[in-house]
Amino acid sequence: MAKTTKSRKKKKSSFVDKHKRVLLIVAVVLVAMAAVSLPFVLTKASADTIIYIPKGTTMEALTDSLKKNTDDTFASRVTTLLKVSGMKVEYRHGAFKIAKGETALMAAYTLRRGEPSELKFTFNNVRTLDEFATRAGNKFEPSKKDFLKALADPEVCAKLDHTPDNIGCILLADSYKFYWDITPEKLLKNMYNYYVQFWNDERTQKAKKLGLTPDEVVIVAS
């Protein structure tokens, strides 16, 4: 009977020791993981910035962009996380905002899985299509040449109830929000939609009383 009791105590003691060892190993692993991940959590962006990812870019190009717009340490840690996660950067496309105070871990998630950011596009005192194309080309991925081509395309203009000669009338000076990789055709379509909303029945009737069409009002005002 005594031997049985001692045997049970030994088994219980052995179980407790094994349990303690497992807990110790788990604790060590957790501490190690925390030590490894801590720099990625503590490293933060020092200012708001936007990272542009062109279609078909490379990890090297993205790293250079991060270094240019943040700092070497932040860029290095974000890049490390992206590589470890297996990100295929060539499939990402757009402009991604990294806010001041955002950790390297959060920034990596934004670049890998986050939604692209819309860019505010404000213009006024634009008197020619060339000026508009210049501003749009400086703000978005398509070039000035791409915008000029769309503005001069009869088919593009016809879909917007205009011609290359009067397409400038839909470009109402205001603030808009578009994605960086928007096509010239889609941007013009969105601006045309705003133009239609602006020229509601009330404004159209006021123009009519003056003997003018909406486009003629725009031309006179410019």
Where are these regions (language model features)?
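Conserved catalytic or metal-liganding residues and their short signature motifs at active sites
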Residues: 2-222
